[in-house]
């Protein structure tokens, strides 16, 4: 009887808390920013079933129609107060994408000089566009690969595109991209998948799908940048936040953030459905990894090379190891982690966890993958080392790098990994003598002043958007193109390090005191 009474009151408490949360969410949405045409106009994308029956020409035709519809329904219908230079949808704006030599919001194909030696499919991240992997595309083209940079459904157009998309649409688009890659460069020429953030989850899931459906073309190598294997914060509950939006007065409740759109190749605003679909994708991915691991069917996975910051606000770094790498076979896989900058004297301001994150992630028992970290040579030196633990070993080997950790940068970020420091748009050190290639040097803005004066959160200016170690990253990706890695031959098997399962970790992380705001996008 006492147990029933406790359960009854517990259930009542949950219902009351849920109603209170929805009431607060509804009230806040009434006072939020007014939704603009780019928040309300939803372009017509091909859905999963249509994508599975389409070819590249069909996808390109639909993409062209989508961009024409955005111009007609958004850019050409702007109210006078939206016709400002900082609005990417204003045709006279310096950040209007269609005015550039190439609109990197669109899918593209790069052909190498001479006969192709392989093909690579590039999969960008959530709220992102094919722009983010264009420097990786250049490397692959120089190495003789046909490069397919694919725009995922709901991306590159208007943020409202993410209000109606499903993760199954992204997976179907990935399959379409692989089909086109193999049409242009048939097997046995190598096929690589490169994924950034949400694109990393898509690349990984595609490779798992191949195990269960041998008719799908197999990738020979995966390169992942900050892959979305597990999501931090409240993403798993994001759908609840959007419930008030079923009533028109609370339409803005369908959005986790509504921000001016000044970034030509990435959305600033983020709808609830974007977080919801990313969570559904990672949940399906983790479940599939668990299922295939239990049946010992992961042995045919291709080598996976991952680059990740130990500090990441968007994805769970521990989940990459516990949910993925500790399940991988001995196949030449490697993870590269970028440590915090220990010479920056921010210790009183940085969370204590930042200084111990790398030690907690390092293997405690021999593993079948290579564990590499980029660290300061010492705590008072900007010089850096590559510290690598080989598969089946625990002893690390150091290699000095010629890339110092820049003063003033205390860590890398989720966004920064695949972007060089001299990138014209996002780079911290672009060529300031040349006119901006894409309207502004967003990554080089170093603004200080009074709070409340800017139209955006200071995160937009202080969050690092380029990687000081990009030359190293490019070198390592190139190594895998020229000299592909493979098994050690030592029959190394994964040994799970002590810790809680990734799904339980995700649930518990929701109640951490500093975890007090919803997942607001990458």
Protein language model features and the residues they cover:
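N-terminal targeting or regulatory segments adjacent to alpha/beta-hydrolase or S9 domains
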Residues: 2-92, 384-522
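Active-site nucleophile loop of the alpha/beta-hydrolase fold
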Residues: 222-234, 340
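Catalytic nucleophile-loop/oxyanion-hole region of alpha/beta-hydrolase
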Residues: 158-190
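Short, surface-exposed "cap/lid" segments of acyl-processing enzymes
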Residues: 98-156, 486
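Serine-hydrolase catalytic core
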Residues: 21, 109-113, 266-453, 467-489
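Cap/lid segment of the alpha/beta-hydrolase catalytic domain
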Residues: 122, 153-168, 240-244
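Short beta-strand immediately N-terminal to the catalytic nucleophile in serine-hydrolase-like folds
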Residues: 193-195, 225, 307
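Gly/Ala-rich beta-loop-alpha elbow adjacent to hydrolase catalytic centers
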Residues: 194-199, 203
């Amino acid at each position: 009887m006492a147990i029933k009474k406790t359960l009854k009151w517990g259930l009542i408490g949950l219902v009351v808390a849920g109603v209170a949360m929805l009431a607060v969410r509804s009230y806040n949405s009434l006072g939020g920013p007014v939704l603009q045409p780019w928040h309300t106009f939803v372009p017509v994308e091909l859905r999963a079933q249509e994508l599975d029956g389409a070819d590249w020409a069909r996808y390109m035709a639909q993409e062209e129609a989508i961009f024409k519809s955005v111009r007609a329904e958004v850019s050409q219908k702007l109210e006078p107060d939206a016709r400002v230079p900082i609005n990417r949808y204003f045709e006279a704006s310096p950040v209007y994408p269609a005015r550039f030599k190439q609109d990197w919001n669109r899918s593209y194909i790069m052909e190498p000089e001479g006969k192709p030696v392989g093909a690579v499919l590039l999969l960008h991240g959530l709220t992102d566009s094919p722009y983010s992997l264009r420097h990786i595309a250049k490397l692959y083209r120089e190495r003789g690969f046909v490069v397919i940079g694919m725009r995922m459904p709901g991306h590159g157009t208007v943020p409202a595109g993410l209000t109606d998309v499903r993760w199954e649409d992204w997976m179907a688009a990935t399959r379409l991209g692989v089909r086109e890659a193999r049409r242009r460069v048939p097997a046995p020429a190598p096929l690589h998948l490169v994924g950034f953030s949400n694109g990393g989850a898509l690349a990984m899931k595609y490779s798992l799908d191949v195990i269960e459906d041998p008719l799908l073309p197999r990738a020979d190598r995966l390169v992942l940048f900050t892959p979305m294997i597990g999501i931090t914060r409240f993403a798993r509950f994001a759908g609840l936040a959007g419930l008030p939006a079923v009533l028109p007065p609370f339409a803005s409740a369908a959005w986790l953030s509504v921000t001016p759109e000044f970034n030509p190749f990435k959305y600033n605003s983020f709808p609830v459905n974007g977080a919801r679909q990313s969570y559904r994708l990672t949940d399906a991915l983790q479940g599939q990894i668990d299922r295939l691991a239990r049946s010992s069917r992961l042995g045919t996975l291709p080598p996976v090379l991952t680059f990740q910051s130990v500090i990441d606000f968007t994805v769970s770094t521990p989940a990459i190891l516990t949910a993925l790498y500790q399940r991988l076979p001995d196949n030449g896989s490697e993870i590269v982690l970028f440590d915090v900058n220990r010479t920056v004297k921010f210790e009183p301001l940085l969370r204590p966890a930042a200084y111990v994150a790398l030690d907690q992630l390092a293997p405690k028992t021999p593993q079948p993958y290579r564990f590499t970290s980029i660290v300061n040579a010492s705590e008072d030196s900007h010089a850096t080392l590559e510290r690598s633990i080989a598969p089946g070993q625990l002893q690390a080997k150091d290699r000095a790098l010629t890339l110092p950790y820049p003063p003033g940068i205390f860590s890398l970020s989720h966004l920064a990994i695949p972007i060089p420091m001299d990138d014209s748009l996002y780079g911290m050190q672009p060529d300031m003598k040349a006119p901006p290639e894409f309207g502004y040097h967003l990554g080089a803005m170093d603004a200080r002043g009074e709070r409340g004066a800017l139209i955006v959160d200071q995160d937009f200016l202080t969050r690092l958007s380029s990687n000081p170690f990009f030359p190293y990253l490019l070198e390592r990706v190139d190594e895998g193109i020229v000299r592909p890695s493979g098994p050690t031959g030592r029959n190394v098997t994964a040994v799970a390090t002590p810790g809680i399962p990734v799904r339980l970790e995700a649930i518990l992380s929701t109640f951490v005191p500093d975890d007090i705001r919803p997942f607001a996008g990458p």
